Amino acid sequence: MENQPKLNSSKEVIAFLAERFPQCFSAEGEARPLKIGIFQDLVERVGGEMNLSKTQLRAALRLYTSSWRYLYGVKAGAIRVDLDGNPCGELEEQHIAHARQQLEEAKARVQAQRAAQQAKKREAAAAAGQQDEGVRRERKPRPQQPRRKEGAEQRKPRPVAAKAPREERLTPVSDVSVLTVGQALKVKAGNNAMDATVLEITKDGVRVQLTSGMSMIVRAEHLVF
């Protein structure tokens, strides 16, 4: 006995039934309502063929009768058919209402799935946009520096030398008669000059008081102002 090929999916089983019973099943287009109890007829007619089991036949029938094209065919005035396409009675109103409800629920599920997919795409696009914006912010180009002319020497600013404080110009006292008591002047001591105040003008010189409080008589050539 030769081995028969095995059908692995419900779609393959439906394609086999449409080829075997073209007056009952169809692989595309609007489907005709099936006779009530057609499952038992299938078991009797194709039992053992193509290694089909009852489970496979039941699953294929469930997929076929829940498809949109089959539910569209379950409408007022439609006639049920058997495996050979013979009429087997008109559809009842309750069966038509049930098919209409199944079709509406199936459409609602598809719309909900599409809406969820659209929302995920929008979220992914928004997240990608934020990430790109963050990368652009991180990689913000630095302002372009003006190009130096070719051959131009790079000049470094010269350090500015600190100006030495100007030496205070002092006038030597040549005539003590020009001095007055309380007048501020300086007493020369080597290269330094100390602040002092005139206390008294004597014949021996000028008595002055230093800022330290010490008083002394100084000759005119040691006084400046």
From Swiss-Prot:
GO molecular function: RNA strand annealing activity; RNA strand-exchange activity
Family annotation (SMART domains): ProQ (SM00945)
UniProt feature, compositional bias: Basic residues: 137-146
GO (cellular component) term, any one: cytosol
GO biological process, one term: post-transcriptional regulation of gene expression
Biased composition (Basic and acidic residues): 147-156
Pfam families tied to this protein: ProQ, ProQ_C
Location within or outside the cell: Cytoplasm
Principal cellular location given in the protein's record: cytoplasm
Region of interest called Disordered, as start-end residue ranges on this chain: 107-169
Chain intervals with Low complexity compositional bias: 109-118
Top-level taxon in the UniProt lineage: Bacteria
Keywords (A to Z) from UniProt: Chaperone, Cytoplasm, RNA-binding
Family to which the UniProt record says this protein belongs: Belongs to the ProQ family.
PANTHER family cross-referenced by the UniProt entry: RNA CHAPERONE PROQ (PTHR38106:SF1)
UniProt-recorded name of the protein: RNA chaperone ProQ
Native source organism of the sequence: Klebsiella pneumoniae subsp. pneumoniae (strain ATCC 700721 / MGH 78578)
